[in-house]
C-alpha cells in the first residue's frame, strides 16, 4: 500500500510539471514565403552585412494588403513592392510593409529591401542549447589574431536567420533561395544548393552565386566564407566535399 501511495505522489508531481510547460504553437500564417533572393557583401571593420533582398510571397488564405517580416537590428535603407517605393514601419525588430494593393491567395508579389544587418547589436537571447542568437558571426574580421582564421558563417536555428536577412523567420515557412555573395578573392564560400557561377571583380573581390530550388525553412539558410581548402570525396557514388582550414587538409 505504501508503494502505491508513493507512485501516486510521483505521478501527481509529473502531471503538475507537465501542466507548467509552456505550449508553443506554430506561428500563425498570414503570408507564405515563396522565393528568397539575396545579394550580400561584408563590412569587416564594423562586423556588418550590406544586403539586398527580393522576397516573393503570397497570402496564406485571406486577402491582405500588408506583410510583416522579421528583421533584427537592421538599418533599413529602402523598401519596394513590385518595384514601387512602399511605405513601411520598422520597430521591435519587425518590418511591416504596406503593399501596393490587396493580394488574394495564390497571387504573388515581391518585396525588395535594401538594408544593413548589424549582428553585434542583436539583443535576443539564445536557447539552452544554442547560447547566442546573433545569426551571423564574424571571426577575427580585422585579422588581428594570428592564431585565428578570418571567417564568416551563420547559424539560424531556430529564428536567427532574420539577424542577417529579412524574412518570416518561422520553422513552418518554406522558401527556395538564391544568394549572390561578394567576398575577398582569397576566400572560399559555401551556401545551400549548388554553386552556379563565380565572377572576379576589379576591386579584389569575387561574387559567388549559389542556388537551391528545394524549399526549406529560413533557419536552414547558410553562408560561410574563409580561407578554406576543399577536400573532395565520394560516398556511395555521391560527391562529398569537406571544407577545412588549410593546415588540416
PLM feature spans:
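Acidic/His-enriched low-complexity segments
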Residues: 18-249
